[in-house]
Amino acid sequence: MSATLASPLRALLRLGLIPQIVIGIALGVGVAIVWPDAATSVALLGQVFISALKAVAPILVFLLVMTAIANHRRGQPTHIRGVLLLYVVGTLCAALVAVLASFIFPTSLVIDAPQASGEPPGGIAEILRNLLLNVVDNPVNALLNANFVGILAWAMGLGMMLRGASETTLVVLNAFSDAVSSIVQLVIRCAPLGIFGLVAGTLADTGLNALLDYAHLLAVIVGCMLFVALVTNPLIVFLATRRNPYPLVFACLRGSAITAFFTRSSAANIPVNMELCKRLDLHPDTYSISIPLGATINMAGAAVTISVITLAATHTLGIGVDFATALLLCVVASLAACGVSGVAGGSLLLIPMAASLFGISPDVAMQVVAIGFVISVVQDATETALNSSTDVLFTAAACRARR
């Protein structure tokens, strides 16, 4: 009997990670439908998986960045400027797509939702101030709180100071970096179990009925994100590399977007993205910096969410929006999206700031935010999948760009 069970198990283990994840998703849906009580219990697997990823991500980023910079020698190629340019262009284009889609498919909301909890930021100045303070955070505090801006700053500073270190010191640094990378690989191997728990728990807790009331709004948001992922981003990559972008696009969606969709955390997906960059044979000096930086500032999905929900509010209230103001919203949404990682509640709590451009009162804006929280199960998951997979996509595009 045990031999009979062992044979399918061995066959399952021989499958690649992506097929295993697909099986985990299917099993999660099945358990949630057939046995909801059990689905609530296995949600613990998902919580453990996310906690493990979040636990290993800060120390991984710190050691990889410090080691990469300490080992860097003059003349070695890096593409950080190119990656940053692609991040900015990608976020602006995503906001523009969202604005155009909102004009083509206007959405009306029933603003009768309960007040959302949380305190929105006062404006872009406050967001930039918070980012600046994060840069000079205490290094221990940055590691404890997963402040990746602060972690990057300290890792880059220490890495530059260690460039003149002895060979023995560099060997020790590389050994620590390799050890943490090995732990990350073990955690990622548990992704099918973790995603099985996340899918089962989410469907058992929320179901899909709550989403049906706001199906049109959700369709516009998800449609924009799919358009950005499958049309806009490939066009940007083609212009950068002059090659067919779709093999790279689909590799990033398979390797990054699936796990990001279910973890709903760009920070938790950093180890997954690092491993994907390694498989794509990208330069470690580039991706060890660009991936954690992208998890903080590359937020195309957030720009889509802010733009679509803000314009849905203006349409509901009968506020006319001219083209110039719409372009201003694109810029504001893009800048605000860069600060999403430092705001509790993410992109949704940045909506009042964007809504203030159109004279919408904070009370009404927070009711709109409450609607956003209703659809956040799908909206936040799709947003994170787009954000995180784009980090790898643009890093790869910059590394492969023709010069």
UniProtKB/Swiss-Prot annotation:
Pfam families: SDF
Cysteine disulfide links: none
Bilayer topology: Multi-pass membrane protein
Subcellular location: Cell inner membrane
GO CC, alphabetical: plasma membrane
Catalytic activity, as annotated: L-serine(in) + Na(+)(in) = L-serine(out) + Na(+)(out); L-threonine(in) + Na(+)(in) = L-threonine(out) + Na(+)(out)
Superkingdom in the source lineage: Bacteria
Any one biological process term the GO annotation gives: threonine transport
Transmembrane segments: 15-35, 49-69, 85-105, 142-162, 183-203, 218-238, 246-268, 289-309, 317-337, 362-382
One MF annotation (Gene Ontology) recorded for this entry: neutral L-amino acid:sodium symporter activity
Main location as per UniProt: membrane
Keywords, ordered alphabetically: Amino-acid transport, Cell inner membrane, Cell membrane, Membrane, Symport, Transmembrane, Transmembrane helix, Transport
InterPro entries: Na-dicarboxylate_symporter, Na:dicarbo_symporter_sf, Ser_Thr_transp_SstT
Family: Belongs to the dicarboxylate/amino acid:cation symporter (DAACS) (TC 2.A.23) family.
HAMAP family reported in the protein's UniProt record: Ser_Thr_transp_SstT (MF_01582)
Summary of the function given for this chain in its UniProt record: Involved in the import of serine and threonine into the cell, with the concomitant import of sodium (symport system).
Record's protein name: Serine/threonine transporter SstT
Organism: Chromohalobacter salexigens (strain ATCC BAA-138 / DSM 3043 / CIP 106854 / NCIMB 13768 / 1H11)
